[in-house]
Amino acid sequence: MPESRGSESSGSTSRRASGTQHIATPKLKDSCTACATSKVKCSKDKPTCARCTRRGLTCDYGLSKRTGRTSHATAQKQQQQRQQQQQSQQEAADRRVSQSAVPVANMLPDVDEFISPMSLQESSILSPTLMPDLSTSGSQAGLDQWNSDLWSTMFAPNEPSSNNTPANTMQTHGGNGNDIDHLFNDLTSYSMLGEPTDTAMSNQHTHTFSDTSSSISPFDQLTSVSDMGSQDFSNIDLSMTNCTPAIQQSVEPANCCLTVALGFMTQLCATASSSCTMPGSHNGNTTLPTIDSVITENRQIVDQIVKILECPCSHDEYLLTIVHLVVFKVMAWYAAAAREKPSLAEEINWTDQQSGRPRSRTHSEEVLRFPPSIDGYSSDGSDNGRMAAQLVLSELHRVQRLVNLLSQRLEGVRLRNHVASSGSSSSLESIGEDSVVGVSLSATAGSPLSSPTFDQLEADLRKRLRAVSFETIDVLRRS
C-alpha cells in the first residue's frame, strides 16, 4: 500500500510538472516600456508601476526577447525556406526564358511547342535566317544593322574626367640652361675667334601647310640605309618643308624631318671608327675627318636640327628621340676634336697584330690631327691643341641653344602626356594652348615613351654638354 501511494503521488507530480511546462506564461521584461524609454528605474510593480501611476501613464510590460542559439528544428526550417525560395526564383527565370523564346520558336520550321533553352541556342546559332549574309556585297551594311548597338558602344568617346592636378606640377628636370655661360666668358676670348657669321639659328622660318591628300604607298617613300649614308643632309633647306606623313602627301624622302634626322645620324656614324664584323661594314675605310671638317659639318647639322625643331612635326616623340641621339653624336665629335692627340703607344696598339683588324678604341670618334684654321689663320703646329680646344669651345654655344630649344619641345611632350593622362579639357585651358599646339590629345593617348624617359634624356644631354665643356677647358688649362 505505501508503495502504490508513492507511485501515484510521483505520477501526479510529473503530470502537474508536464502540464505546467506546456502552459507556462511568457516571460515579461523587468522594466515597463515607459520607464525603459525614459531610461529611469522602474519600481516593477504590476500591473502598474509607481511612476506610471503617479504620472497617469499606461504601464505596459513587453515580452522579453530571449537570446541564445537557434534550435536545430528552427535552423532546418530556415534552410528549407531558403531552398524553396531559390527554387522558385529558378523556376521564374526558366519561365521568362521560355516566354522570350516563343517568338523565335515561331520563326523556326518544324519546332516543337515546348522548346528548351539549349535547343533554342543551337537553333539560333545554326539557323541561316537569324545570321546576316556576310558573303554578299552588302555584308558590311548587314553587319551594322545586325549589331549596331555593339559598334556604338565600342566607338563611343570617353567622358572627360575632372582635372585635379594643376599645371604647375609639371617641371623640367634638366637644370638651368645657362649653367656654362660663365665658362665661355672666363676662359675663351671671342674677339680672337670672331663671331660666327651664320645667322640661320636666329632666323624665323614660316611653314606652309596644305591639306592635300593622295594615296601613295608608304613603301615608295622609304630610302635604304646605304643610300641614306651616301647623301649629304647638312645642306637641305627645311624652311618651307611640308612634313605631312608620306601616306597623306607626296613628299621627297630627303625633305621629311624624320628622314633628315636619320640621315644625320648615319652621316655622323659613317666616319666613326668601328670594329663591326658585319659584311659591308666598311672597315677598310680608315680616312679620318679633319678638325675643320668636323666643326663645319657639326655647325651645319646643328642649324638644320634647329629648323627641324621649329617644324610642327617636332612634336613627334620618335623624331625627338632621334634628335637626342644626333645631338649626343654631335657633342661626341666636338669632344673628339678638342681631345688631345693620343700617345704613340696608343696609335701602335690600335691595330690587332694577329687579326689585322682595328680594335675598339676608348672613343669611337677620331679626327685627323691636322692644324686647324681660324678665320684663315693656322698655327705652325705648336699650338694645335689649344687652337682646336678654343675653336670647339666657341661652337658649344650653338649646342647649348639647341639643347634649350629641345628642352622646350620636351616640356610640351610632358604637358601633353599630363593632359592625356588626366583626360580633361579643362587641364588644357589651364596649361595653355601654346604648349600643346599642333598635336591632338587623341594622338598622345598611346605615347610610346613615358615622361620620365624624356626627363632622363634631357638630364643626360645637359650632363654631357657640361662634360664636353669641362674637358675642353681642361685642355686649354694644360696647354
UniProtKB/Swiss-Prot annotation:
Localization terms from the record: Nucleus
Traits of the deletion mutant: Leads to drastically reduced, but still detectable production of dothistromin.
Record-level Gene Ontology MF annotations: DNA binding; DNA-binding transcription factor activity, RNA polymerase II-specific; zinc ion binding
Keyword RNA-binding: no
Pfam families: AflR, Zn_clus
CDD domains, per the entry: GAL4 (cd00067)
GO biological process: aflatoxin biosynthetic process
Keywords from the UniProt entry: DNA-binding, Metal-binding, Nucleus, Transcription, Transcription regulation, Zinc
Cytoplasm among keywords: no
Region spans: Disordered: 1-25, 63-100, 349-382
Protein's organism: Dothistroma septosporum (strain NZE10 / CBS 128990)
Name of the protein this chain belongs to: Dothistromin biosynthesis regulatory protein aflR
Role played: Transcription factor involved in regulation of the dothistromin biosynthesis fragmented gene cluster.
DNA-binding residues (ranges): 32-59
InterPro entries per record: AflR, OAF3, Zn2-C6_fun-type_DNA-bd_sf, Zn2Cys6_DnaBD
Compositional bias annotation for Low complexity: 1-20, 76-90
Annotated Gene Ontology cellular component terms: nucleus
